[in-house]
Amino acid sequence: MVPARSLAHPHPHLVRRRRDHAAAAHGATARCDDDDDGVVTPRGPTRYMAQEPINHHQHQHDPPKQPPPREADDDHHRIQEREPLPPPTTTTRNQRLQLQLGGDGHHNHHHHHHQEVAGTSGSSSGGSSSNNGGGGTRDWLRLATGPASPGASAGSDHDLFPSTTTTAPAPQPPTPTPTPTPTPTPRHHHHDVLVLPGMPPPGSFLRPGPAMPGIPQASIPTHMLRAAPPWLPPWSPVAAPPPLLPFPHQHRAFYAAPPTTTPPASSGFDAIRVVLPPSAVAAAAGVWFVLQAAPLQGREPFLPQIPRSYLRIKDGRVTVRLLTKYLVNKLGLEDESEVEITCRGRQLLPILTLQHVRDSIWCRRDAVSPSAAPDIPTADHHQHIMVLQYGRRP
């Protein structure tokens, strides 16, 4: 038979080893029975008594603990970079007085106002008020050190005066790292330059160039100058542009003719040169012209003068052929081939438009035929209105 003591403690040597290690590590004492074969009846387990046997041989032969993986270290450093530590509170910061009045009744409004000034939370002020006895009629003074700026007062007061309640604070979501904004360079009032709309940049009036009375030369770029009409002679590249005349005429820009060695002509057309194209009002006026019977015609009988000589065509794209039909109807002729129309001594083709005749033939002085020049009237009004002569074709 197996003794009862052997059933209760099948491994007495393990119990003895536990006693030796517990006595050496924590200084605990145990009572032993000498009459038995090493069975120990230990005391009740104390607060610092080892619950499991310590096997020194197992610790000696265990492999060394592996270091944490590199990914965990990277995550740890990344979290530290994402959440910067709060700046340490130094004693050199300005100290401010935070007064909070606790209580109920008419003191509640002042208490709430001073809570906002001090930057403390409602839970911390409520816990402090309850510790004062719960009376609510006692005024108390709270002193704290914190930065003078109001932006950082809320976080500093919460750290200096934590709540006395045992409830754990709710976990706060991680705040993103604020992006550092560049500090603007301080400017002085003498660094600012007043720039008005339409005003050229400073120094543009110092550019060299021929000056024009009334208009700075720098405000008119060279590539912005518009060319003269094709029937006018071009300016010399070495000569300066002529001065601007002071009088306006239907919002057009007129320039005086360049100085020449010969005296200018008596006509006003030679003294004024039109640079800008005609306005929309002038373009809508159409083409004015005069139909005159030529003094020298190809054969007799000569064609007579029509009663209505001044005509206006609204559309400048009307061709010379339409004028020929008009003369055939007015003069009672049989065929259009009997009539020819000329301008400055040059015979006009039927396909030419009146606008082309005016711009390319009438307005060009070099297009005047020497044989037809004496036949053109010299009246002033004829110099501004296109004159077309008609006659019988030989």
From Swiss-Prot:
Q: Where is the composition biased (Pro residues)?
A: 170-185
Q: Which GO terms describe its cellular component?
A: nucleus
What does the UniProt entry report for the null mutant? Absence of axillary meristem (AM) in most of the lateral branching of the panicle, and reduced number of AMs at the vegetative stage.
Q: What are the boundaries of the region Disordered? A: 1-193
Comp. bias (Basic residues): 8-20
Q: Which UniProt keywords apply?
A: Developmental protein, Nucleus
- Give start-end positions of Low complexity composition bias: 90-101, 119-131, 146-155
Which InterPro entries does the protein's record reference?
Answer: LAX2-like (IPR044171)
Regions of compositional bias (Basic and acidic residues) in chain numbering: 60-84
Enumerate the subcellular locations listed in this protein's record, separating them with semicolons.
Nucleus
GO terms for biological process? positive regulation of DNA-templated transcription; regulation of secondary shoot formation
Superkingdom classification of source: Eukaryota
The protein's assembly and partners: Interacts with LAX1.
Q: Which PANTHER family match?
A: RING FINGER PROTEIN
Q: What does this protein do?
A: Involved in the regulation of shoot branching by controlling axillary meristem (AM) formation. Functions in association with LAX1 to regulate the process of AM formation. Possesses transactivation activity in yeast.
Record's protein name: Protein LAX PANICLE 2
Q: Which organism is it from?
A: Oryza sativa subsp. japonica (Rice)
